[in-house]
Swiss-Prot record:
Taxonomic classification: Bacteria, Pseudomonadati, Pseudomonadota, Gammaproteobacteria, Legionellales
One GO MF term attached to the UniProt entry: peptidyl-prolyl cis-trans isomerase activity
This protein's record includes keyword Signal: yes
EC number(s) on file: 5.2.1.8
Cellular compartment(s): Cell outer membrane
Domain PPIase FKBP-type: 144-233
BP terms from Gene Ontology: protein folding
Protein name per UniProt: Outer membrane protein MIP
Annotated InterPro entries: INFPOTNTIATR (IPR008104), PPIase_dom_sf (IPR046357), PPIase_FKBP_dom (IPR001179), PPIase_FKBP_N (IPR000774), PPIase_FKBP_N_sf (IPR036944)
Keyword Membrane: yes
Signal peptide: 1-20
Family: Belongs to the FKBP-type PPIase family.
Activity control summary: Strongly inhibited by FK506 but is completely resistant to cyclosporin A.
Species: Legionella pneumophila subsp. pneumophila (strain Philadelphia 1 / ATCC 33152 / DSM 7513)
Swiss-Prot/TrEMBL keywords: Cell outer membrane, Isomerase, Membrane, Rotamase, Signal, Virulence
């Protein structure tokens, strides 16, 4: 994290210099256009991350360093400033993450409390909920068996985060190699069945951030069609 932030800061100095020295209406050379494009891209990233900097001061620092002029801050002062910046940014990110995790947990619990009273919804001791859409008559898989499924995963607000429809082909995997909510549900499903399962965060990814739309402590919904089961030898 530290090296990434330092690298970003150094790049920022270079890019803001290029932007300050180049009028956006007179990008005559490829070098001008490249410099401007990289600077604009970095500026967007800084804005999206909430990093507040002074472009003029960044440009001045780069110019002084490249020209060999006396720097306005000592090496130790600059190191201290960057270290504080990194520490403050990490604290901010952690606070934002924890707030989001708490919000998702509360929303997920409220959803499950309401959902369990809906017609056809079954609640298991683990907290996993499911509803049978179509009941198959095939074999039920065990933990070590391999299954082939079609599925769509979405958040409780309806956002689809994954689906076999995107790839156009079903997914095949061992029952024990997925999130606990899936492992539990699959072992109850006869092949040929289609279920909708409602997975509490503790049976999904928990407080971890897995990227994409799935945040920490997310309750997840999956529509699963169990196509086939291959028993382990």
């Amino acid at each position: 994290m530290k090296m990434k932030l330092v690298t970003a800061a150094v790049m920022g100095l270079a890019m803001s210099t290029a932007m300050a020295a180049t009028d956006a209406t007179s990008l005559a050379t490829d070098k001008d256009k490249l410099s401007y494009s990289i600077g604009a891209d970095l500026g967007k990233n800084f804005k999206n991350q909430g990093i507040d900097v002074n472009p003029e001061a960044m440009a001045k620092g780069m110019q002084d360093a490249m020209s060999g002029a006396q720097l306005a801050l000592t090496e130790q002062q600059m190191k201290d400033v960057l270290n504080k910046f990194q520490k403050d940014l990490m604290a901010k990110r952690t606070a934002e993450f924890n707030k989001k995790a708490d919000e998702n947990k509360v929303k997920g619990e409220a959803f499950l409390t309401e959902n369990k009273n809906k017609p056809g919804v079954v609640v298991l001791p683990s907290g996993l909920q499911y509803k049978v859409i179509n009941s198959g008559n095939g074999v039920k898989p065990g933990k070590s068996d391999t299954v082939t499924v079609e599925y769509t995963g979405r958040l409780i607000d309806g956002t689809v985060f994954d689906s076999t429809e995107k790839t156009g082909k079903p997914a095949t995997f061992q029952v024990s190699q997925v999130i606990p909510g899936w492992t539990e549900a699959l072992q109850l499903m006869p092949a040929g069945s289609t279920w909708e399962i409602y997975v509490p965060s503790g049976l999904a990814y928990g407080p971890r951030s897995v990227g994409g739309p799935i945040g920490p402590n997310e309750t997840l919904i999956f529509k699963i069609h169990l196509i086939s089961v291959k028993k382990s030898s």
